[in-house]
């Protein structure tokens, strides 16, 4: 059932991307606050079950108090933010690799449940999320990176030839991942690839990322979590909402407080970029 849901979802998402890209109003605006709240409500929730993973982890480590997990979880997040502020350029390559791998891995989990793909393959697959906005909307994308303390101006990531090579490698990775898979799984990978390309050709990079992150990446991961909680979809979705709501609410409060604080020192778009991307990374 989950494979059929993934196919139908990718088909609807692909058609929607083409439809949305046809509106000049959407192409000429960034919708900063709408992006912020969409990621806050829909995007953050797909990672809000980390506490369940934490409970499994402390059982393995034979730790009885869940508070230790939350303490370490918070300290890791704060540590990432601190390192980001102090050593941004040193973290740049690591950030890009981890982000690419994360997107490549989670967006292809539906076809690789019992199959191990290489780290490199999944990293190249997921690199399209970073490569496509830099290739098709470079100036605005560089503004986003600059606002989160990353300077790409002296890197290969501003060279068109290098970006085209990475884009081709991402496409080839999708073909390799789809090898020996059924028609639906092949179609999902290709529709996802061209959906992301379409979004980044026509829309502002922040809006393109928000649509991808909330309505493709987070949606697919949430569906996977729902079926892990309960094989009955209706029961699973209510259980997912119940378990995801507390951490989503807490994260939302932190994001809003951070935005309000940063907005006193920076422009609104810079503040939103910092909260979204540094917040998601941590």
What residues fall within each predicted segment?
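Alpha-helical transmembrane segments of multi-pass integral membrane proteins
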Residues: 97-101, 106, 121-141, 159-177, ...
């Amino acid at each position: 059932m989950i494979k059929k849901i993934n196919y139908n979802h990718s088909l609807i998402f692909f058609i929607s991307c083409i439809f949305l890209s046809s509106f000049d109003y959407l192409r000429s605006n960034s919708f900063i606050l709408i992006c912020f709240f969409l990621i806050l409500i829909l995007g953050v929730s797909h990672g809000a079950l980390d506490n369940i993973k934490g409970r499994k982890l402390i059982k393995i480590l034979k730790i009885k108090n869940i508070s230790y997990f939350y303490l370490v979880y918070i300290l890791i997040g704060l540590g990432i933010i601190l390192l980001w502020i102090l050593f941004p350029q040193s973290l740049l390559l690591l950030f890009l690799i981890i982000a690419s791998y994360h997107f490549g891995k989670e967006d292809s989990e539906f076809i690789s449940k019992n199959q191990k793909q290489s780290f490199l393959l999944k990293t190249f697959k997921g690199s399209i999320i970073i490569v496509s906005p830099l290739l098709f909307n470079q100036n605005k994308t560089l503004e986003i990176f600059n606002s989160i303390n990353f300077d790409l101006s002296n890197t290969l990531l501003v060279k068109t030839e290098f970006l085209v090579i990475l884009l081709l490698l991402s496409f080839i990775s999708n073909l390799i991942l789809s090898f020996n898979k059924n028609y639906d799984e092949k179609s999902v990978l290709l529709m996802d690839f061209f959906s992301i390309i379409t979004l980044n050709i026509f829309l502002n990079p922040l809006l393109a990322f928000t649509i991808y992150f909330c309505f493709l990446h987070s949606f697919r991961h949430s569906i996977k979590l729902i079926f892990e909680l309960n094989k009955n979809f209706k029961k699973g979705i209510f259980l997912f909402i119940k378990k995801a709501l507390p951490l989503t609410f807490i994260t939302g409060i932190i994001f809003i407080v951070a935005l309000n604080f940063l907005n006193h020192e920076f422009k609104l778009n810079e503040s939103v970029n910092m909260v979204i991307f540094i917040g998601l990374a941590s």
